[in-house]
Amino acid sequence: MQNEIKKVCVIGAGVMGSGIAALIANSSHQVVLLDILDKDSNDPNKIVKNSVKNLHKQKLSPLSFPDKVNFITIGNLEHDLDLIKECNLVIEVIVEKLEIKHQLYNKIIPYLKEDAIIASNTSTLPLKKLKVNLPNNIKSRFVITHFFNPPRYMELVELIIDHTIKDEVIEKVSVFLTKMLGKTIIKCNDTPGFIANRVGCFLLELVVHKAIAQNLNFVTIDQIFSRCLGLPNTGIFGLYDLIGHDVMKLISSSLISALPKSDDYHRIYTNTKVFDKMIEHNLIGRKGEGGFYRLSVSNGKKIKEVINISDLSYHPVQKVDISFNSLNELLSSNSIYGKFFSEIITEFYIYLTSLVPSVTNNIYDIDTTMKLGYSWHYGPFELLTIAVKNGWNLIIKNADLMNIPLPKYLASKEYQKIDKQKFNSKKDFLQESKIVLSNDSANLIHYCENLVFVITTKMNSLNHNVFYLLQEAVSKAENYGKNLYIYPQGNNFSAGADLKLILSYIQDGNFHNLENLLKLGQQTMRYLKYSSVHIISCARGVALGGGCELLLNSSYIVANQELNAGLIELGVGLIPGWTGVTEMFARSNGNKTKLIRNIKNIIEQNKTSSADYFKADYGIKNMQVNMNKHYILDDALKLRISKKIVSIPNKITLPKINIVSEIDTSKYNELQNKVLNKFQNIIDKHNEISEAELLTYEREMFLELAKTPQTIEKLQAIVG
């Protein structure tokens, strides 16, 4: 069996199927997208064509860049089955009906490559039922890959396997999902709902049914879940609306039909009359006319409303006073909501622990699933172990009071074996590696025979000490003759300048120190650009303002596909002051089109939505796109780059243009027009300009803007 999946076929061009196809295209892999024949049209591929067109229209774009669509080949299941012969992996994403899936499998089997893998994206059907009628040689190559919607943005994929599947198949799929598509995979047993739906939907149904029965305030419950338990702001009722009441009914009904009568899901999912009535009135959530919440418009303003379950009327959401600041306070309260949450949490953890080991014997996988699949801040085991005082004993005590028998996991005190260190999944390079240089804002470490610079400030913001140590790090790398890697602590490369520091200088009238900070930053960026060794930046998350300037001065970038980067300083009333303006002029070097594009990047605060857009919009030449942010340093260390040819600053040619006549400024504000005029003055005064002159202009403009009340107001609003 070959080790690599080179081409994929996705069958089913609905929202999920087309999203998976787009994800694969984003990784620059060829993908075939097939769906049924449109018999009512002269175009047999109309269904798939419309689906692909829709990829460009969605608010959260499934495509990382428009031309990625060229990796998608379309067809239908009548005329184009031969396209399957070229594919190493076939992902089925069709309706959740077993009979229809079986019909499809029988249809495509004759066209499969000898070692091709079949995967179903089902979220409700068991693996054993999907493959029951398949030939043995196909069964050993059949898995479930449960992607989450939207596939591009949700990191989790549940991989469902059994003992009949070959190890090389599991390895091949796992490598493709993680390295090529950037996913974190959780291997699940073949049980109803796998992990995410079994755990997440149980909690949703438990809370919603119990709250309705007790006539409690939905808004209060959602805010408590968000504040005290670390759930997203949608809470429970908001998430129910987001998923869709019709979809929740489908999932829960499927679970009920598959689970034994003894399973607690049967007990909590009983009285559904209210839900059925809401569905009848198209109150199915965000995609309907409303749900538990809805947005209405009054006098041009959007108003969030909450439903009155008794008559399905709506009224504006009122601000609620939450007196609990922690989960411990909540659970120790004798209030209505204190008692409600004590019952909810007890019932939830009784159910959760009853799933070990049948659903999975790895509790840390459950935590990862809930954090990635449902965006919880804590996994459920992490929450009870770390955030609640004597949490496990509390559950056992409450279970006794509620006369609920303990599952084996609790009765045998398995929770005592929980390793708290495993809840921190981040790889700590500082612990693993030798520190070469260090201060309170950054470290230079020796990792795998390489020099890695790690910023340690909040959001990796930039200040004096970061720049001082970075200059030392460059010198150290040059002395060793080694490339220097800039790697982010946490999920973000750098959010830019320490705005609190900048605001303090402005408020104190200390513009001398502010100018020195600008000079230090500019000097450091020039150190990077003109160093004798390569500066290789590993960028993920955000690289904004000064963080973007770090990238612009690196000789090579390994950027995660989901990178958000850009020169956004104008949003706080400033301009890029650490060579950002200089770089935008230098990178155009006489090219009118490039100069206009680069000026617009600054004026319009262009924050790109992907690494592909950053490469195109900011004219980045030496960049490799990485799909999995967790492997970004590994990918950087594998680069084979020839020895750096050190360049020297040259004069920059400026084309003679009138920027205003080239750019639509009709929607520009006073600040944008002011900065545009400053740039025009530079163009009018010079045919050629040196970097040193541009850097001086850059500092002068920055300091001038820093003294305006508007800038101070913007900075105060952000810093707080």
Swiss-Prot record:
Task: Name the GO terms of the biological process aspect.
Answer: catabolic process; fatty acid metabolic process
What EC number(s) has UniProt assigned to this enzyme? Answer: 1.1.1.35, 4.2.1.17, 5.3.3.8
Domain of life of the source: Bacteria
Query: What SUPFAM superfamilies does this protein's entry cite?
Result: 6-phosphogluconate dehydrogenase C-terminal domain-like (SSF48179), ClpP/crotonase (SSF52096), NAD(P)-binding Rossmann-fold domains (SSF51735)
Keywords (alphabetical) are: Fatty acid metabolism, Isomerase, Lipid metabolism, Lyase, Multifunctional enzyme, NAD, Oxidoreductase
Which InterPro entries does UniProt cross-reference here? 3-OHacyl-CoA_DH_NAD-bd, 3HC_DH_C, 6-PGluconate_DH-like_C_sf, ClpP/crotonase-like_dom_sf, ECH_dom, NAD(P)-bd_dom_sf
Which stretches of sequence are listed as region Enoyl-CoA hydratase/isomerase?
A: 453-720
State the protein's name: Putative fatty acid oxidation complex trifunctional enzyme
Q: Which reaction does it catalyse?
A: a (3S)-3-hydroxyacyl-CoA + NAD(+) = a 3-oxoacyl-CoA + NADH + H(+); a (3S)-3-hydroxyacyl-CoA = a (2E)-enoyl-CoA + H2O; a 4-saturated-(3S)-3-hydroxyacyl-CoA = a (3E)-enoyl-CoA + H2O; a (3Z)-enoyl-CoA = a 4-saturated (2E)-enoyl-CoA
> Which portions of the sequence form the region 3-hydroxyacyl-CoA dehydrogenase?
1-384
Keyword field contains Transcription regulation: no
Q: Which Pfam family, any one of them, does this sequence belong to? A: 3HCDH
Tell me which family the UniProt entry assigns to this protein: In the N-terminal section; belongs to the 3-hydroxyacyl-CoA dehydrogenase family. In the C-terminal section; belongs to the enoyl-CoA hydratase/isomerase family.
MF term (GO), any: 3-hydroxyacyl-CoA dehydrogenase activity
